[in-house]
């Protein structure tokens, strides 16, 4: 309908003087150059003859015009198509509304314009509104195009595929003393996994419940030489290797302590004996009491090396769940009691932090080859797999189990279910046959910057 409007040949330079400063809405200036505001003004003045039809026509035209402009219809419907009556009504009654409505949309230099020109510009106001929104549409389109990239980057903050028991076990096994307080467990998890830096109250409740309701975790009270708040948590010495070869994705079996009553009786005997006992010595005393027939005759600090070592050894050799419930006498024939010197040595190693880093654990649990001491009274038979790691080279050997960054292991979008051995998110893993280490061991650049100590150990 724009072709029906007669454009007279007035010079557009008269209106260009009003646009000396840069325009906020460049589309209005383009309309000024293309349509010619003088032509619109003269057309509006020429339409004054059509107002002779009476005020009813003008009011109808003004109402029609206001409804069009208020509804945000296209300017061709609002300013062009209704005809002379509607245009006159716009120039008369809707002119003031056009001036008021165009205030925030147009340059302030348009204020000296007459009512008719302001009304004509009011008819063009929807152009400015639509064009001012067009950059927003463009930005929205660009942001939608960028969304997949940001979503892909957020995979490093995805929820790790480990259970809370696995996370607690990781934290305890990497600590030098094999025991941590509750706050230290929280901090270790948040340092290693960015996902757990939010919604802390939820998952920390789950961590506390896992510590309380699983027999594989033991609460160790603070000793006088370690003042502070909160007790320590450690792994049960009889729980064995719950995670095969350091794979923390799934436990082999749930550790269930079936001798709670025997533990209480052993605790009473230990308190009456007057000597300190290790957290795991009570269970071994109960097993020794069943084997010998009298738990009260066993000294409080005395452990039978067979009773404490045989469940873990049998479990590592592929023993089934019935080995935990069976008495110690059913596993192997009884062996002679240890000498007092060996008892003191075992109690010292079980109670305190490691003082002999040169003593090696069993050979098939470590990638490095060391001499294995298979003597029945050696330190290997007196300690479980968790405590044996006290005597490994913490500061002189390379990391045996370095946890790997998600984005380097998982190779998204494959997810956690990728069939590669690196989906376990662990470093080198060796089995009993002495296979070569996984080639993913050297790539630990992400989390080593966060946590400089050895992050994970297989034993």
From Swiss-Prot:
A GO CC annotation given for this chain: cytoplasm
Sequence segments annotated as region (Transactivation domain 1): 14-93
Alphabetized InterPro entries for the sequence: Fork-head_N, Fork_head_dom, Forkhead_box_C, FOX_domain-containing, TF_fork_head_CS_1, TF_fork_head_CS_2, WH-like_DNA-bd_sf, WH_DNA-bd_sf
Free-text tissue specificity from the UniProt record: Restricted mainly to endoderm-derived tissues (lung, liver, stomach, and small intestine). Expressed in epididymis with region-specific expression pattern: no expression is observed in initial segment, low expression in proximal caput, gradiently higher levels of expression in middle and distal caput and highest level in corpus and cauda (at protein level).
Any one GO MF annotation of this record: RNA polymerase II general transcription initiation factor activity
SUPFAM superfamilies documented for this protein: Winged helix' DNA-binding domain (SSF46785)
Region (Transactivation domain 2): 362-459
Sites of Phosphoserine modification: 212, 284, 304, 307-308, 310, 438, 459
Cellular location(s): Nucleus; Cytoplasm
Chain intervals for the UniProt region annotation (Disordered): 268-366
Residue numbers of Phosphothreonine PTMs: 156, 302
SMART domains the UniProt entry points to: FH
PROSITE patterns: FORK_HEAD_1 (PS00657), FORK_HEAD_2 (PS00658), FORK_HEAD_3 (PS50039)
Posttranslational modification: Phosphorylation on Thr-156 abolishes binding to target promoters and subsequent transcription activation upon insulin stimulation.
Disruption phenotype: Embryonic lethal; absence of organized node and notochord formation, which leads to secondary defects in dorsal-ventral patterning of the neural tube. Mice deficient for Fox1a and deficient for Foxa2 in the endoderm from 8.5 dpc onwards do not show hepatic bud formation. Mice deficient for Fox1a and deficient for Foxa2 in the midbrain from 10.5 dpc onwards show almost complete loss of mDA neurons.
DNA-binding region(s), residue ranges: 159-252
Quaternary structure (record): Binds DNA as a monomer. Binds TLE1. Interacts with FOXA1 and FOXA3. Interacts with PRKDC. Interacts with AKT1. Interacts with TET1; this interaction may recruit TET1 to specific genomic loci to mediate their demethylation.
Name listed for the protein in its UniProt record: Hepatocyte nuclear factor 3-beta
Organism: Mus musculus
Gene: Foxa2
